[in-house]
Every structure is written in structure tokens, then in C-alpha cells.
Regions:
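Cytoplasmic/organellar membrane-interface segments at the starts of transmembrane helices
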Residues: 128-131, 183-256
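Hydrophobic transmembrane alpha-helices and their helix-loop junctions in integral membrane proteins
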Residues: 3-4, 8-189
Length: 256
């Protein structure tokens, strides 16, 4: 449960602090160091993605995907545009659901299998179809598949960044391509193919686990199709932060 709490709440403290304190209390310093931070954010996106691709442990895989995702969040914050800032704020919300869902399901898988090594899983869609489908949906949200929650926020971050730092945004899109590798390859190994010996008698999600994961999956889907209520809450603050930092927004305001 510690991993889920960390992903849902604690790892957002840093990016919240960037918005709430760094930019608003030290706008001149933030403006000075913005190019450096954008560069570090792009490095984080690419580094986290490559490290995730090389992981053989499922929890390590999910952890490194978060490094890549937080690169997108930081890039959106320091793009200093209303779209980028709104996308970063929305990304924090979406990340809390999609990655926490991955950790939850991975925890249930490891509890049943007694292992966290990706190669020890295989053919789970035949043995535990409900658990397989929930893992697939959470993974596709982490991939930012259109129609799921992370797509909207990642799109806003990249569009908002492109208007001020086009090179960073273009390089950042490489993270999307790499995400397809670090999500789809494990999905293929874990859910498809022949059933790995030792997985034949694994049990599917019980009622308690289904009740726990169902609201998270529902939010992931709803936020992908209709993020407007959350954006309506986020946009005014995002626009004000950009103005307070002394930047003129080069793009139309989100939702206008």
C-alpha cells in the first residue's frame, strides 16, 4: 500500500512546490533558470523511458515510468504557458490514478505469483482475465492512449511547451514513442503468449479487489473522454501563475 500512497500523494509534493512556492515566491529566479529546468525535464523524460525499457522487475518498471512522466509535468510547469501549466496540473491528477492502478494490480499479481520478475508472468489473460484487463487499461493510460486520462494532459503539456520551446517539445515527443516500448512489451509478456508454468492456478481478482480498483479505472476512462470539469478548476490558477511569473501567454487560454 505504501507504493500506491506515494504515487497518489507524496510524489506530487515536489511539483506542487514548484508551482506554489518556487514560481510564485521567486518569479525572477524561475524565469532565469527556466531553460535549464526545461532541459533537465527533457532528460528526465528520455532517461526514465530508457531505464523503464530495460527493467526486468515489474515494480522497477512502473517506478521508472514515473520518472519519465514527471519530466513531462516539470516541462509543462516551466513552459510558462497556460496550456502547459494546465496540462501539468492535470497530469498530476491523472498520474495519481493511472500509476497507482498499475502498482495496485502489480501488487496483487506479485502476491499471487510470489515474484516480481516480468518473465515469471505470461498468459494471464487466459487465467485471470479481469486482472489482465485492468492492468491493460492502466498501462494504456500510462502510455497516454487517446480516450484515457493521461492523453489529454500529455497533449496539453506538449502543445503548451511547443509554443515557447519547440525543440524541447519535439524531443519530448520521443518519450511517447519510448512509452510504447516500455508499456507494450511488458503487456505482451505478461498478458499474452503461452501461460508460464506456475501461473495455471492463479486466482482472478476477488470482490474486494474489484471494488477497490473499479473506481480508479472508471476515473481513468471518464477523465479521458470528459476532462472539462477538472480543467475548469485548474485553468484560472494556471493562468494566474503564468501571469504572476511575468510571462505573456503566447497561446489561447485552455477552454476558451
Amino acid at each position: 500500500m505504501g507504493s500506491e500512497m506515494c504515487i497518489r500523494d507524496r510524489d506530487k509534493v515536489g511539483t506542487y512546490g514548484m508551482i506554489r512556492f518556487c514560481i510564485q515566491l521567486f518569479p525572477d529566479a524561475s524565469k532565469t533558470f527556466t531553460p535549464l529546468i526545461i532541459t533537465l525535464a527533457v532528460i528526465s523524460i528520455i532517461y526514465g523511458a530508457f531505464m523503464a525499457i530495460g527493467q526486468k522487475d515489474i515494480k522497477g518498471l512502473i517506478a521508472f515510468t514515473s520518472i519519465s512522466h514527471f519530466g513531462f509535468i516539470t516541462m509543462g510547469i516551466f513552459a510558462m504557458t497556460s496550456q502547459g501549466m494546465s496540462g501539468a496540473n492535470l497530469y498530476m491528477v491523472n498520474h495519481g490514478f493511472s500509476t497507482a492502478a498499475l502498482f495496485l494490480i502489480a501488487g496483487w499479481m506479485m502476491m499471487r505469483r510470489g515474484s516480481s520478475t516480468i518473465s515469471d508472468f505470461g498468459g494471464l489473460q487466459r487465467v485471470t482475465p479481469v486482472m489482465a484487463w485492468t492492468f491493460f487499461i492502466a498501462g494504456m493510460s500510462s502510455l497516454a492512449l487517446p480516450g484515457l486520462s493521461s492523453f489529454v494532459s500529455e497533449f496539453l503539456v506538449l502543445v503548451g511547451t511547443y509554443t515557447r520551446y519547440p525543440v524541447a517539445a519535439i524531443i519530448g515527443t520521443l518519450g511517447i514513442i519510448l512509452a510504447a516500448l516500455y508499456i507494450l512489451i511488458p503487456v505482451q509478456k505478461i498478458l499474452h503468449g503461452p501461460t508460464t508454468p506456475g501461473n495455471e492456478n492463479l486466482t482472478d481478482l476477488n470482490l474486494r479487489e474489484k471494488i477497490a480498483i473499479a473506481p480508479v479505472i472508471l476515473v481513468i476512462v471518464l477523465m479521458g473522454f470528459y476532462p472539462k470539469p477538472v480543467l475548469d478548476l485548474i485553468n484560472p490558477t494556471s493562468e494566474q501563475v503564468v501571469i504572476n511569473a511575468g510571462f505573456s501567454d503566447p497561446v489561447a487560454k485552455v477552454g476558451k
